[in-house]
A protein has these predicted regions:
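Asp-based, Mg2+/Mn2+-dependent phosphohydrolase catalytic module
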Residues: 1-7, 87-89, 114, 118, ...
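A metal-dependent, Asp-based hydrolase signature
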Residues: 52-97
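Short, acidic loop-to-helix structural element flanking the phosphoryl-transfer center
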Residues: 71, 88-90, 98-127, 165
Length: 235
């Protein structure tokens, strides 16, 4: 019997306003017109820079404070623009890092999230497991989501991500879960595979795209969850 619903965060409950988690809300305004034009015509190089910068983030993922996160994103943007061979001043990198960490406007929650979670909580515990940074807790709180949750596990607190089964096993222990009684909702089939390996019932969220696999139940929004739960409970 399903009694707990565990969500991923990005792509499931919220999305980056810019369309990219590494492009904060004021990215182009901070860079200025000239640098913005360079980037627009060198998007391939920018993406390569993000890949290189993300390697640094992944290798240094154990952090607990927003101050540590800010310092990490200062280094991240240095790597990105070095990879692009663009001269960006320290003051600009500081502003980008500040915008990436401290500006809640960089994300939007989907319209069904608050009411959807409230409805689900009448019959289920609701939790989040996310590959993320310390500022997520503040973003959740400021958007009225944190107080609705029965549990939150963030990858940065454990230096583990959903790319392996480890973070799911940590969540089982930390949140006292029986994974056989839990749905896990994510927009990444590879994450769902690891969740299933840990014993969770995987559900694929496809907010804006067509499902790339028929291996898992697919939902378009939180209202679709009851039907999935009903079919699982019948089994």
């Amino acid at each position: 019997m399903i009694n707990t619903i565990v969500f991923d965060y990005g792509g499931v409950l919220a999305y980056p306003v810019s369309g990219n988690w590494f492009i904060p809300y004021n990215f182009f305004k901070i860079l200025g017109f000239g640098n913005s034009i360079k980037i627009i015509f060198r998007r391939g190089k920018l993406n390569q820079g993000f890949i290189k910068g993300n390697e640094y983030l992944t290798a240094n993922h154990l952090l607990f404070t927003e101050e540590e996160e800010y310092e990490q994103f200062m280094a991240f943007y240095r790597i990105v623009f070095s990879e692009m061979k663009m001269k960006i001043s320290d003051s600009v990198r500081e502003k980008l890092a500040k915008d990436a960490v401290y500006n809640d406007n960089r994300v939007r929650f989907y319209d069904d999230v608050i009411d959807g979670i409230k409805n689900l909580k009448t019959g289920y515990r609701v939790m989040i497991i996310s590959d993320t940074w310390p500022s997520l807790r503040r973003v959740l709180k400021n958007n009225g989501v944190l107080d609705l949750l029965d549990g939150l596990v963030m990858s940065c607190s454990h230096n583990k991500t959903k790319e392996t089964v480890d973070l799911f096993n940590i969540a089982v222990r930390e949140l006292n879960l029986n994974p056989a009684e839990c749905l896990f909702v994510d927009d990444s089939p590879s994450n769902l595979k690891n969740a299933a390996s840990a014993g969770f019932h995987p559900v694929l969220m496809c907010r804006r795209t067509e499902a790339q696999t028929d291996e898992y139940p697919v939902i378009r929004g939180l209202d679709d969850l009851e039907a999935v739960i009903g079919s699982l409970n019948e089994d």
